[in-house]
UniProtKB/Swiss-Prot annotation:
Organism the protein comes from: Monkeypox virus
PROSITE patterns: ALPHA_CA_2
Lineage of source species: Viruses, Varidnaviria, Bamfordvirae, Nucleocytoviricota, Pokkesviricetes
Stored InterPro entries: CA_dom, CA_dom_sf, Carbonic_anhydrase_a-class
Protein name listed in UniProt: Cell surface-binding protein OPG105
Protein family according to the UniProt entry: Belongs to the alpha-carbonic anhydrase family.
Single GO cellular component term: virion membrane
Subcellular compartments: Virion membrane
Modification(s) after translation: Apparently non-glycosylated.
Amino acid sequence: MPQQLSPINIETKKAISDARLKTLDIHYNESKPTTIQNTGKLVRINFKGGYISGGFLPNEYVLSTIHIYWGKEDDYGSNHLIDVYKYSGEINLVHWNKKKYSSYEEAKKHDDGIIIIAIFLQVSDHKNVYFQKIVNQLDSIRSANMSAPFDSVFYLDNLLPSTLDYFTYLGTTINHSADAAWIIFPTPINIHSDQLSKFRTLLSSSNHEGKPHYITENYRNPYKLNDDTQVYYSGEIIRAATTSPVRENYFMKWLSDLREACFSYYQKYIEGNKTFAIIAIVFVFILTAILFLMSQRYSREKQN
């Protein structure tokens, strides 16, 4: 079977809760950002120091870079989805197996060489003072292929979510250049809309007319799961707040199944028949809203 391409939509009802997946040991206290770069496609920050271990990892994986993704609007900018729920953005923390391999380039040639942590960004009413330290650096890399020293004290630990339960699966790097094991924290960190909009002011590589344009979005659409791809979860299986069908209600279960069928149709035809794909994803949005409203009503009825 071919390797599972990343990113994916994680269906929580199909994920396997595995008690053997212990809490990760995250050692970012000694990690320091060295440079920040506008690649023309994304924001990349290079790090020195810091590593992760524990969990299911055979040994220590050192932090190399972080990549930041966003969308045109605040409601969709993440690569990965949880039950078709889209987050405002996503940070990918790329690590490599330094104990076993001599370099990142060597590590990415092997299926146990790369680990990527995904942290979701969710727009809220309040600014994130820690994320702001990254935002403050963006003026120094406004044009494509610009790089600058990261000249602010920055502690990556402060960008970790409040809950560190995680999903994990075997996939690829976002650009599909290497195999990678993914660790995805479903609990997002909150940022302000103004902070995210600053990323949309960055310039990308020139288009066919030779004129630079803005990186208004850079997220990737999810890929269909291979038949043999399995997603595991380190805690009790959760459901995203906007996709919590009440299983006692058969009508809601039917709506949930219909929504998933529409999303599968969207994934299948997005590269071909875009019209039908757009219709399918519109139905996904509508059904998600209906399910959310019905689940809220059901919750109130239970409380009463």
